[in-house]
Amino acid sequence: MLKFAVLCFLVIMASTFAQKCGDQVCGAGTCCAEYPEIHCKRVGQLYDICVDSEATKDSGNHLFFCPCDEGMYCDMNSWSCQKKTSGRSE
């Protein structure tokens, strides 16, 4: 019985943290990107092409690319993910 309760808890937690994206559900480390179709895409890593994390469509999805992973920011001059430095305020 305890195993069943733990399994139910894990399923509920997974569905809470997942993002619905068209017919898919995006998990951790991904975002829902649109163009040419809606699909789950990995969040930006160092030097990946990115979009500002605030740039979302009305649907909450990102257009073209995902924002950068934690600890990084999207440099809008180069449109690439860069590491945050201690002197940078976001």
UniProtKB/Swiss-Prot annotation:
Covalent S-S links between cysteines: C21-C32, C26-C40, C31-C66, C50-C74, C68-C81
Annotated InterPro entries: Atracotoxin
Modified residues (Serine amide): S86
Sites of Pyrrolidone carboxylic acid modification: Q19
The entry's keywords: Amidation, Disulfide bond, Pyrrolidone carboxylic acid, Secreted, Signal
Signal peptide (residue range): 1-18
Keyword Transcription: no
Tissue expression pattern: Expressed by the venom gland.
Entry's Gene Ontology cellular component terms: extracellular region
Compartment(s) of residence: Secreted
Propeptide: 89-90
Highest taxon listed in the record's lineage: Eukaryota
Family affiliation: Belongs to the MIT-like AcTx family.
Descriptive protein name: U1-hexatoxin-Hi1a
UniProt source species: Hadronyche infensa
